[in-house]
Design a protein with these regions (language model features):
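Non-transmembrane, amphipathic alpha-helical segments
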Residues: 60, 64-68, 92, 184, ...
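Short, charged, amphipathic alpha-helical segments
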Residues: 98, 177, 194, 217-221
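Short, contiguous acidic/charged loop-to-helix segments that flank catalytic cores in large enzymes
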Residues: 127-131, 190, 210
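A short structural micro-motif
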Residues: 40-41, 103-104, 167-170, 185, ...
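Mg2+-dependent prenyl diphosphate-binding active-site environment of isoprenoid biosynthetic enzymes
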Residues: 1-159, 224
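Short, amphipathic C-terminal "tail helix"
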Residues: 199, 204-206, 210-231
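Alpha-solenoid HEAT/Armadillo repeat architecture
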Residues: 24, 146, 169, 208-209, ...
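Mobile late-domain/C-terminal helix-loop "cap" segments
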Residues: 155-207
Length: 231
């Protein structure tokens, strides 16, 4: 089977439908939570498509983080919620673990933005610079745009921003490879990596509500994995 983005989306939809069948066996409260999660996921995808409000009420970076929480954080948070709830954890611990999952989902997506620029196809399974070529405004791109709009931008910053937003030129493999290498080496990508680490640390704080046990250790390892893959 030749996998591509369309097949991956369809596979995800199939898994989600089968999860819905499982939720139906658990009771109405779980079905309701599952439906709300799916709603958040879809609305997050719509927000991603339409983009940040043009009235300046929300900064593009804050809006992007909101999209990550709705698209990915909601899904990982739901997985944590189901596990904690079905294990009959206290309401406080259920909330803490749900927040752990949501924050970790944001960290996962931010780390993916770094991998798109600094990894290889063999390691990540993605073509480096694929997001640039598609015109996807990832966090490094948004941070560079923010820098270019400030008085602190250098001519190099402005030139690079023009390069990575010239979608016609980026269809050329050589141009894309060079633009990807330049943006990957720019400080905004290191800033993005640091933000991924910060979101992992934020997620780990929620585990303070748990006593030390093998489950907590496994969750901690899972959280660290999100940034360890950047090394």
């Amino acid at each position: 089977v030749q996998w591509n983005n369309t097949l991956a989306v369809m596979a995800g939809d199939l898994i989600f439908s089968r999860a819905s069948a499982i939720m139906a066996e658990l009771g109405s409260s779980y079905v309701s939570y599952h439906a709300r999660t799916f709603e958040r996921l879809c609305l997050g995808q719509m927000d991603d498509i339409f983009g940040a409000p043009q009235d300046g009420s929300v900064s593009p970076i804050d809006f992007y983080l909101h999209v990550l929480r709705e698209k990915t954080g909601s899904l990982i948070g739901a997985a944590a919620y189901y596990g904690a709830s079905l294990a009959h954890c206290s309401p406080e611990l259920v909330t803490a673990l749900t927040n752990f999952g949501e924050d970790l989902g944001v960290a996962f997506q931010i780390a993916d933005d770094v991998l798109d620029l600094r990894s290889t196809t063999a390691k990540s399974g993605k073509t480096p610079g694929a997001d640039l070529r598609d015109g996807t405004k990832t966090l490094p791109v948004l941070l560079l745009a923010d820098l270019v709009a400030s008085p602190y931008a250098t001519p190099h910053d402005r030139d690079l921003y023009r390069e990575i937003t010239d979608l016609d030129a980026l269809q050329d493999d050589a141009v894309l490879a060079l633009a990807t290498q330049k943006l990957g080496a720019h400080p905004v990508t290191e800033q993005t990596r640091e933000l991924a680490v910060a979101w992992v640390e934020r997620a780990l704080e929620h585990l303070d509500a748990m006593e030390e046990n093998p489950v907590k250790a496994a969750l901690r390892d899972f959280a660290h994995l999100q940034v360890n893959r950047l090394n």
